[in-house]
UniProtKB/Swiss-Prot annotation:
Cofactor(s) listed: Fe(2+); L-ascorbate
Name of the protein this chain belongs to: PKHD-type hydroxylase Abu_0724
Lineage summary: Bacteria, Pseudomonadati, Campylobacterota, Epsilonproteobacteria, Campylobacterales
InterPro entries referenced in this protein's UniProt entry, alphabetically: Oxoglu/Fe-dep_dioxygenase_dom (IPR005123), PKHD_C (IPR041097), PKHD_hydroxylase (IPR023550), Pro_4_hyd_alph (IPR006620), Pro_4_hyd_alph_FE2OG_OXY (IPR044862)
Residues given in the record as 2-oxoglutarate binding sites: 169
Residues that bind Fe cation: 96, 98, 159
Enzyme class, spelled out: oxidoreductase
Organism field: Aliarcobacter butzleri (strain RM4018) (Arcobacter butzleri)
NCBIfam families per UniProt: PRK05467.1-3, PRK05467.1-4
Domain Fe2OG dioxygenase: 78-178
Keywords: Dioxygenase, Iron, Metal-binding, Oxidoreductase, Vitamin C
Length: 226
């Protein structure tokens, strides 16, 4: 499932993040690339040791944990500490697949990567090129979202970032270990939750809505890994 989640950051949060990122000290992004991806990666990144990194991470984690659509789609067990990168002057990231296991330096623990996310800090009209291209069983998807919006997709997806030929593209990228390991099970639960919420809006807490909700929570109980 590939999902666009709009307005993850408020206007105030977005403005603060952009102002800080515009003054940040950027380093070579190859530092965090895995063996498979290191030759494909051509961008800049905030160092994990930079105090700004943890400050921005707190803003993003707070925003994600208070976003109902994100919670419904990801069913997160753990949000691996976000990273931040910048593309300019032809910067790009060739085809790659994210590592299946990542170590979170803040938590001092390894986590499974079920879901990958990119949160945009720059609007599409601020740069040329820089499309994120995600390939899955349904085809190829080009992604270039408004600032403050997020794209969510399975970490097993082949993806790339096209060269930025003009302007600057800044994003945060992160991974989620979900309570639900299987992508198709997460998709089933997401669609079921959407149906329940829609029924509640249109008809209130009727018997059918309650019954569906019971089945939803039974599936969560059956499929979740805690």
């Amino acid at each position: 499932m590939i999902l666009h989640i709009p307005e993850v950051l408020s206007k105030e949060q977005l403005t603060e993040c952009r102002n800080l990122l515009n003054k940040a000290n950027w380093i070579d992004g190859k530092i965090t690339a895995g063996n498979q991806a290191i030759n494909a990666k051509n961008n800049f990144q905030l160092a994990e040791s930079d105090p700004l990194t943890n400050y921005l991470r707190d803003i993003i984690k707070t925003a994600l944990n208070s976003n109902p659509l994100f919670i419904s789609a990801a069913l997160p067990k753990h949000i691996i500490s976000p990273f931040f990168n910048k593309y300019e002057n032809g910067g790009n990231y060739g085809n790659h697949v994210d590592n299946s296991i990542l170590f979170d330096m803040n938590e001092k623990k390894a986590f499974r990567t079920d879901i990958s996310c990119s949160l945009f800090f720059t609007d599409p009209e601020e740069y040329e090129g820089g499309e994120m291209v995600i390939e899955d069983t349904f085809g190829t998807h080009e992604v270039k979202l408004p600032a403050g919006d997020l794209i969510l997709y399975p970490s097993t997806s082949l993806h790339r970032v096209e060269p930025v030929t003009k302007g600057v593209r800044m994003v945060s990228f992160m991974w989620i270990q979900s309570m639900i390991r299987s992508a198709w099970k997460r998709s089933i639960l997401f669609e079921l939750d959407n149906t329940i919420q829609s029924l509640r809006v249109n008809y209130g807490e009727i018997e059918e809505t309650l019954n569906l909700s019971i089945h939803y929570h039974k599936l969560i109980q059956e499929w979740s890994e805690l």
